[in-house]
Amino acid sequence: MNFIKTHKKDFIYCCVIVLLAVAALVLGVALASKKSAEEKSYYDKKCEVFAAENANFSRGQIVFIGDSITDGCALDTYYGALDLATYNRGIGGDTTAGVLKRLDSSLVALEPSKVVLLIGINDINGGVKKGEIIDNYDKILKKISESLPNSEVLCVSILPLNDDLESYTGISVAKSTETILAVNPEIEKLAEKYGYGFVDMFSVLADDENRLPKNLSPDGIHLSDAGYRKYSTVIKPMLCD
């Protein structure tokens, strides 16, 4: 009898342990899901902001779309004198795949008359193959041409880098530059394919060694005020027509 009672107690004890473990697991998953929802990525947060802005923004204006170089640009400072409003749809860290994914809400919904597209450097620095970059870029332009047949598009070449970037990231600037120089002509071909404009901003900004001059960048990849001013002196006249 004692033997049976002992085993019965052991069985109950094991059941309690199992139930507690299951409860802890369920609670842990719930908390993790809640934390994940609360800690949305910068990309997701920006996409939500853009979607919310769309209802209040005018159609037929100018949209700049791309990565951190666009995201960090104070458009009113460099393009404020234009007749049309300028909307910034840049997201720091974005890639060609990211832009393609958000085209509808970030661009198409605004029905812009002009689009300035600058994207690709994060793909290159992240090791994305040239073929995939070009394929994504092609899909971006195809989507724009189908959804916004009356919009003018300006495809800006990927910009140069300098060795400051390598010093704090370990990214090989020489290797990235080699890829940039291989990708930019392909972007130009795609722009021509869809009847869009192309700006070789790499050549505008690069020095004799194909590097971004230090006075134009604070960190080897992003633009300083001087960099944005040089950039805008080329882009701005193209948006005045």
Where are these regions (language model features)?
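Serine-esterase "nucleophile elbow" of acetyl-processing enzymes
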Residues: 28-113
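Cell-envelope and extracellular/periplasmic
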Residues: 90-91, 119-124, 206
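Alpha-helical scaffolding segments of alpha/beta enzyme cores, especially the outer helices
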Residues: 135, 139-143, 182-189
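Catalytic His-Asp segment of secreted/periplasmic serine-dependent ester chemistry enzymes
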Residues: 161-241
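Oxyanion-hole/transition-state-stabilizing segment in secreted/luminal serine hydrolases
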Residues: 71-81, 97-135, 143, 154, ...
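A short helix->loop->beta-strand "cap" motif at the edges of active sites that frequently abuts
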Residues: 148-152
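N-terminal Sec-pathway targeting helices
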Residues: 2-20
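Soluble or luminal CAZymes and related metallo-dependent hydrolases
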Residues: 42-45, 95-99, 132-136, 179-183, ...
